[in-house]
Swiss-Prot record:
Superkingdom field: Bacteria
Organism ancestry: Bacteria, Bacillati, Bacillota, Bacilli, Lactobacillales
Protein's UniProt name: Small ribosomal subunit protein uS2
Keyword Chloroplast: no
Record-stated family: Belongs to the universal ribosomal protein uS2 family.
Gene3D superfamilies for this protein: Glucose-6-phosphate isomerase like protein, domain 1 (3.40.50.10490), Helix hairpin bin (1.10.287.610)
Gene expressing this chain: rpsB
Amino acid sequence: MAVISMKQLLEAGVHFGHQTRRWNPKMAKYIFTERNGIHVIDLQQTVKYADQAYDFMRDAAANDAVVLFVGTKKQAADAVAEEAVRSGQYFINHRWLGGTLTNWGTIQKRIARLKEIKRMEEDGTFEVLPKKEVALLNKQRARLEKFLGGIEDMPRIPDVMYVVDPHKEQIAVKEAKKLGIPVVAMVDTNTDPDDIDVIIPANDDAIRAVKLITAKLADAIIEGRQGDDAVAVEAEFAASETQADSIEEIVEVVEGDNA
């Protein structure tokens, strides 16, 4: 049984790509058709590739992989943080700082500074410092937490990186590739898929679509770490009377949505 059903993908709007004029021709094989100037992603392929991504992430987690979730645009930020935390992993959901991976030593120094400021508050140091200095420290902590809080406890450079919108996160992808870190990503019709190791053709601009795919990969990590019983089997995964499971039905839904 597929880990994500066609019905779930349709309801989340995973099939909607970008305007045809903004497409990347390398994504042609993942596109089913065009409707009203919008490319429609072939969801039968999305189902297949989502299965492959799930298996990849589950197997990596079973081998104690450290996974970094990356998604800095507003549609992805909440899901990336929530699902990374739920699966016991790490995330960056604000601006990617250049060198986060390739200059890991420097990043660790900034993380150490963040932890130092937190300790200063906890051990009472703030109480004996001038208010102005405390205000500056709090400002520094807030900034460090914003950009590095999601990787504060990451023990090492990640073994796998999951990315929402690699077109936007090009620097992150390049750093991962330079270090030989495999990249799993939601890839929309405007993206070059060549640098992605495990592709999930999908709309990466809709909050529901991002949540659906990201949550499923978090499930894969949990299963890899804890076994099948750790992941609840949702009733939606079973065939239903309303499930669309043919290309023709997808087109009908798309035409209806764009009417």
